[in-house]
A protein has these predicted regions:
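Short catalytic/ligand-binding loop motif for oxyanion handling, primarily in non-cytosolic enzymes
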Residues: 14-16, 49-50, 64-65, 112-119, ...
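Short, structured active-site-proximal loop/turn typified by the sulfatase FGly-forming signature C/S-X-P-X-R
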Residues: 18-60, 105
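Active-site-proximal N-terminal segment of extracellular/periplasmic enzymes that hydrolyze or transfer
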Residues: 1-37, 469, 506, 513
Length: 514
């Protein structure tokens, strides 16, 4: 059977790539697009790593597996819990490949930590495979266990780069460390594919989107994409191999930062409590300043290992309180709504939820800056999500205008600002490209859903499509290709849950949960 090699390009968009394709910067990608079927994709809302990598691999929307962003907000229980791979209640396309006797390898795809038992191999990656806010994980991130030692010995493999990129003024060794990491992802994926004779291989370049966030189309991102282009050429030359390029979402240059919880407070939907941030912030004591000093002194690892996490969490972030500390800053008895970043908004059912929702949605539709409305859509949760976990969905979901970054920090004081740390923000418009023996070269297709990828890739491997997958099989096969529906299979064990605090800290350092 022809092998399929899927390259997951976190945050890739044709908006970023088209100029480089046209000016000759990415010659292999340009040539590949001429001989393939390709499309712009539409991600599930919100267009973020969590949940969209699982949307790709499961063919389902978040209402089917119960994760809507990096955190789960439960105002009844007064908790905010950070998600990891064990929280996604779903089987994935490689489970169906295994069920049909085909082997698969998944390298560095977010949402896969703790590593699941997939036949043949899983190498979990960023951002969820972590040991602490400023420390990479050294072991326990592979299936089978022990493979992590082999990768370290043979490839000097790392899950996260060191030093970690944390700002757009860091263009030296932090960027070089990411480029080295991307190179090793490809080396490991190709080696495992060949040595283990894998029939399906998926490798994700998560830190590619970290470069997008901090630099957009500047030189660090361009260097990374030139590296990707070189590997695209190598993979395209492999015999009997389908090559698929895809992304979990797209990206666009940031124009506006919108502090949604600050806006909710201003509009009367949220009431506040005084916190330690209110004392330390006026003194200039924030996490960004202290990290900069620690990096300069070369003591980041020492401080991360010696200062207890609970003490680290007391140091405020410049943008305001995040994660569970958001609820410490909120008087829930007088609060009607609390937001996560990048789209989800949760309502307090101690109030009249439908009345609050109607009023809040109307107000959100009117929010604007100098460039117009901030949101292209404001939806009820049930309009966006379906499935057994839809009752846990946020009551409201906003779709951000390209370039708008919705920040969930509480207590920073500002509502709408110019971009701060991030030069680019996520958008729902990602990429898909399929080339190789099993695919017809149909050129540009109409916009497709990210949910279409899993059923299409199963059909490429002569597998039937489970009835609980929402996507459609793309018209990129010859007329002789046939398939049927099949019953879904049940989910096996997914491993022990990782400490959600550690996951949150890594996301926070990268700017995902600022």
């Amino acid at each position: 059977m022809t092998r399929t090699f899927v390259v997951g390009l976190d945050g890739a968009s044709w908006r970023l790539l088209d100029p480089w394709i046209e000016d000759g910067t990415l010659p292999n990608l340009a040539a590949l697009r001429e001989e393939s079927s390709w499309a712009q994709t539409r991600s599930c809302l919100p267009p973020v790593t969590f949940p969209n990598w699982k949307c790709y691999s499961s063919g389902k929307d978040p209402g089917d597996f119960g994760v809507y962003w990096f955190e789960r907000v439960d105002l009844d229980a007064e908790t905010i819990e950070v998600m990891n791979g064990g929280d996604f209640d779903t089987v994935e396309l490689w489970d169906y490949l295994n069920d049909e006797g085909q082997s698969a390898g998944v390298i560095n795809m977010p949402t896969m930590y703790p590593p699941r038992e997939v036949e043949d191999v899983v190498v979990a990656g960023g951002p969820d495979a972590v040991e602490g806010e400023y420390r990479s994980i050294d072991s326990g991130y592979t299936h089978p266990s022990g493979l992590d030692d082999e990768l370290a010995d043979r490839f000097d493999y790392r899950v996260h780069p060191e030093p970690l990129l944390s700002g757009n003024d860091e263009r030296g060794e932090e960027v070089d460390a990411i480029l080295d990491l991307l190179e090793k992802r490809f080396e490991v994926a190709v080696t495992l594919a060949e040595e283990r004779d894998l029939e399906y291989v998926h490798v994700t370049l998560f830190y590619l989107n970290v470069l997008h966030h901090f630099f957009w189309d500047e030189e660090p991102s361009k260097r990374a994409w030139q590296l990707v282009d070189e590997w695209v050429g190598k993979l395209d030359d492999m015999d009997d191999t389908n090559l698929v390029l895809m992304s979990d979402h797209g990206s666009a240059p940031t124009t506006t930062e919108f502090y949604v919880n600050e806006w909710l407070a201003e509009q009367g939907y949220q009431a506040r409590e005084r916190t330690v941030e209110d004392v330390l912030r006026p003194l200039g004591l924030d996490r960004e300043n202290l990290l900069r000093v620690a990096k300069t002194a070369g003591v980041v690892d020492l401080l991360a290992e010696t200062i207890p996490e609970r003490i680290q969490q007391l140091i405020p972030q410049r943008e305001g309180a995040k994660r569970a500390r958001k609820l410490e800053a909120v008087d829930l008895d007088r609060t009607q709504a609390v937001a996560s970043g990048q789209g989800p908004i949760y309502l307090n059912d101690d109030f009249d939820v439908e009345s609050v929702r109607e009023s809040l949605m109307a107000d959100l539709r009117q929010v604007e800056d100098d460039e117009g409305k901030l949101f292209t859509g404001v939806y009820k949760g049930e309009e966006v999500y379906d499935g057994p976990y839809a009752d846990e969905a946020p009551e409201i979901v906003v779709d951000m205008r390209p370039g708008v970054h919705v920040n969930d920090g509480i207590g920073g004081g500002e509502i709408t600002t110019a971009p701060d740390r991030w030069a680019a923000e996520n958008t729902p418009q990602g990429i898909f490209l399929a080339s190789g023996p099993d695919f017809e070269a149909r050129g540009q297709l109409k916009q497709m859903s990210i949910l279409d990828m899993a059923p299409t890739l199963l059909v490429a491997h002569d597998c039937d499509v489970p009835t609980d997958m929402h996507g459609e099989v793309l018209p990129i096969f010859d007329d002789d290709r046939t398939w049927d529906s099949r019953e879904p299979i049940s989910l096996g064990g997914t491993g022990a849950a990782e400490d959600s605090e550690e996951v949150a800290e890594r996301l926070q350092q990268l700017g995902y949960m600022e």
